[in-house]
């Protein structure tokens, strides 16, 4: 029967002797290649194409020998005689012992950790061999004339000594090496995605932390000594070799990469070999705790090797250049101190000007207030509105920011009985405005120019005002504005404009003498303003005046009035005044 045939065939094959016979799941199915990981000849049965293959698990008193990725490829091929080659012939003794002692889990194979005893023995053999080599023969230093061909010679003792750690690391079994190389990388990536472990009780966490710190410190010191010695030896030998060959750039880069690889490989083996010793101290470390420590130690050793190689290749001229650079910088700073003095002086003067400007303005305002108080005491017949409005208007202009937006225009008017008071008061108010500068205000009299040509008067007025303002005078008095030729008054567009005035930091005081004998004190400021406007309109415009750009017309007069009528104040007569003498 089919069951007997399979039983007989199982007797002939390797570990099939230990398999307990079992009836097939389905009859009439052909036999296929093993599907249990590629390491056994357990019979399996064909499955329909639409379904995935199912593995059959058989248990016995002694589990069969199962190998995963490390099964030799020769075992899968049939021998010429027709029998399958026994797997034990291709395995080392150590591997056979590991397999016999391991548990058989076909569906979920866990990653095996190397036993602490074997790892300690392997570390002892390597340490003993290194000590014997150092005791028998001191480390040879490669001579400067050694060539690359001599280094590559397999019979030279220098190469054997330089690559001793690499040969020792190769004696480890293939399975152990692969687990060492794969563990840090895979655990590194997975650990970052895992949650941190639960907290331990305080007394347990304290004891565990002390043990781990003590063991980690010991391992780090030993790893520093071993890997630093190997990295320094390799870098020195190869840097001397590259000096003779002539290709410094290409070979130094290759040496740099190889030294990186050797230091990292030796660090991996050393750290993994010492893992069981730490585990045997009473606390088993999880992979989450081992991976950060391994990466941290490996990074430290790579940095040490890089630093030493850079120090070895650095020329003395570079270091001396760094030392001598400090005095040069010091002398450079001392020499540049003299250039800082003019800069400091400029900053000091600028700050002095910035902070002194408000003081100057404050002093100018105070001086103007003192002068106005004196005038108020002299001209006691004037209305209180005259003093209050004029002083406030001019103080505001003095306190305004620099540059000022527009000039200050003040228009004073009076009747025939107050002609002398109008003349004296207008001049003294203008002088009070410029009293801080200790200069007199510009004086222009319209009665002297009444019979002159309009264009000539315009030119003369322009020259007097512009020259005076350019020479430091900041105030001007224009007497008898109504006596100017009508066309000549258009020049005041230039000096009285709200936005485009030629000089904005100045004050102009204009006077208009009305034809009335007296000006009542009961009139308001609005009524006085309208009276002056009507009077100027009669004086400057008539039906016989031609319409031209240099002749006055109602439109031009309206524009001029809007520029000179900022503040219109009446002046009353003073009985104490004598003719031609001001108070």
Swiss-Prot record:
Record region (Interaction with TOR1A): 356-583
Glycosylation, residue list: 399
Coiled coil: 359-435
Gene Ontology terms, MF aspect: ATPase activator activity; ATPase binding; cytoskeletal protein binding; lamin binding
One Gene Ontology CC term in the entry: nuclear envelope
Stretches assigned to the Nuclear side: 1-338
Modified-residue entries (Methionine sulfoxide), positions: 146, 301, 552
Listed Acidic residues bias regions: 216-225
Subunit structure: Interacts with ATP1B4. Interacts with TOR1A (ATP-bound). Interacts with TOR1B, TOR2A and TOR3A. Interacts with VIM.
PANTHER family: TORSIN-1A-INTERACTING PROTEIN, TORSIN-1A-INTERACTING PROTEIN 1
Protein name: Torsin-1A-interacting protein 1
Protein source organism: Homo sapiens (Human)
């Amino acid at each position: 029967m089919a069951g007997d045939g399979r039983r007989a065939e199982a007797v002939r094959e390797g570990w099939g002797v230990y398999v307990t016979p079992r009836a097939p799941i389905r009859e009439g199915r052909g036999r296929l290649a093993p599907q249990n990981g590629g390491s056994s000849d357990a019979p399996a049965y064909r499955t329909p194409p639409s379904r995935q293959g199912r593995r059959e698990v058989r248990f016995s008193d002694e589990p069969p020998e199962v190998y995963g990725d490390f099964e030799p490829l020769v075992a899968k091929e049939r021998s010429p005689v027709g029998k399958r080659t026994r797997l034990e012939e291709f395995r080392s003794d150590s591997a056979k012992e590991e397999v016999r002692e391991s548990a058989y889990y076909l569906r979920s194979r866990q990653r095996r950790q190397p036993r602490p005893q074997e790892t300690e023995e392997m570390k002892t053999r390597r340490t003993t061999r290194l000590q014997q080599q150092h005791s028998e023969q001191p480390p040879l230093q490669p001579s400067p004339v050694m060539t690359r061909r001599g280094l590559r010679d397999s019979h030279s003792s220098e190469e054997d000594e330089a690559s001793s750690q690499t040969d020792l690391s190769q004696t480890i079994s293939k399975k152990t090496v692969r687990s060492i190389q794969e563990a840090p990388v895979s655990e590194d990536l997975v650990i970052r995605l895992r949650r941190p472990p639960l907290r331990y009780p305080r007394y347990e966490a304290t004891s565990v932390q002390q043990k781990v710190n003590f063991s980690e410190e010991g391992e780090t010191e030993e790893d520093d000594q071993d890997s630093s010695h190997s990295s320094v030896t390799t870098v020195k030998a190869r840097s001397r070799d590259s000096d003779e060959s002539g290709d410094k750039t290409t070979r130094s880069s290759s040496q740099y990469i190889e030294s990186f690889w050797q230091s990292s490989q030796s660090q991996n083996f050393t750290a993994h070999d010492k893992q069981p010793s730490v585990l045997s101290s009473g606390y088993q470390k999880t992979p989450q705790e081992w991976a950060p420590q391994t990466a941290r130690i490996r990074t430290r050793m790579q940095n040490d090797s890089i630093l030493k190689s850079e120090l070895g290749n650095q020329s003395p001229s570079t270091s001396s250049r760094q030392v001598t650079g400090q005095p040069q910088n010091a002398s450079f700073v001392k020499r540049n101190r003299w250039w800082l003095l003019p800069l400091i002086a400029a900053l000091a003067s600028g700050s002095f000007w910035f902070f002194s400007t408000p003081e100057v303005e404050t002093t100018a305002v105070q001086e103007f207030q003192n002068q106005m108080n004196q005038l108020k005491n002299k001209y006691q017949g004037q209305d209180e509105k005259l003093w209050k409005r004029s002083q406030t208007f001019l103080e505001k202009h003095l306190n305004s920011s620099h540059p000022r937006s527009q000039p200050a225009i003040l228009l004073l008017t009076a009747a025939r009985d107050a002609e002398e008071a109008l003349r004296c008061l207008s001049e003294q108010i203008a002088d009070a405005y410029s009293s801080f500068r200790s200069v007199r205000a510009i004086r222009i009299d319209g009665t002297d120019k009444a019979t002159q040509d309009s264009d000539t008067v315009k030119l003369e007025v322009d020259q007097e005002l512009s020259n005076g303002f350019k020479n430091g005078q900041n105030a001007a008095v224009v007497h008898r504005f109504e006596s100017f030729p009508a066309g000549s008054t258009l020049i005041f567009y230039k000096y009285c404009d709200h936005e485009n005035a030629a000089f904005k930091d100045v004050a102009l005081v204009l006077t208009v003498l009305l034809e009335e004998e007296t000006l009542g004190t009961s009139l308001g400021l609005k009524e006085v303003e309208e009276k002056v406007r009507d009077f100027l309109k009669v004086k400057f415009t008539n039906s016989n005046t031609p319409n031209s750009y240099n002749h006055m017309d109602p439109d031009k007069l309206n524009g001029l009035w809007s520029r000179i009528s900022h503040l219109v104040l009446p002046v009353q007569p003073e009985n104490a005044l004598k003719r031609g003498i001001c108070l």
